[in-house]
Regions:
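Surface-exposed, interaction-prone regions used to assemble/regulate multi-protein complexes
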Residues: 1-128
Length: 128
């Protein structure tokens, strides 16, 4: 079993929704809802986001970290980085040290986010 990033009990019962994305800061905020609730229970913040793949709403907040090789493959496949980076071990190491592939499996698809970090927030700043 893979380790859950946020360690939320009954994580598959929660619903996620994209709340805001700030391209200048590369920050992605997600609203997380308990079953049958219309107000968010909490938020998730992904920082230094390079990639997001998924619908704007989905079931499950059971995020886990994918393999660093899968993260690098996705960065190469999408053209975010070029294959030349593989010729420079220091650059390759920096990417694999800072970029993480966050995954969540839903009943219908797999959500993929490449970011440097993720945090759970009780509230979000009022000015966003």
């Amino acid at each position: 079993m893979l380790d859950s990033v946020f360690e939320i009990a009954n994580a598959r019962l929660y619903r996620c929704q994209v709340y805001r994305y700030f391209s200048g800061l590369s920050r992605l905020y997600l609203s997380v809802f308990k079953p049958k609730q219309t107000a968010p229970a909490f938020y998730l913040l992904f920082s230094d986001v390079a990639y997001f793949e998924g619908p704007v709403n989905w079931q499950s907040v059971d995020f886990y970290i994918g393999a660093s090789e899968d993260c690098l493959d996705l960065l190469l496949q999408t053209g975010i980085i070029g294959p030349a980076v593989l010729q420079f071990p220091d650059a390759y190491a920096t990417i694999t040290d800072t970029a993480r592939l966050y995954l969540v499996d839903t009943p219908n698809s797999q959500i993929r986010i490449i970011a440097s970090s993720a945090a759970r927030l009780d509230t979000v700043p009022a000015n966003i």
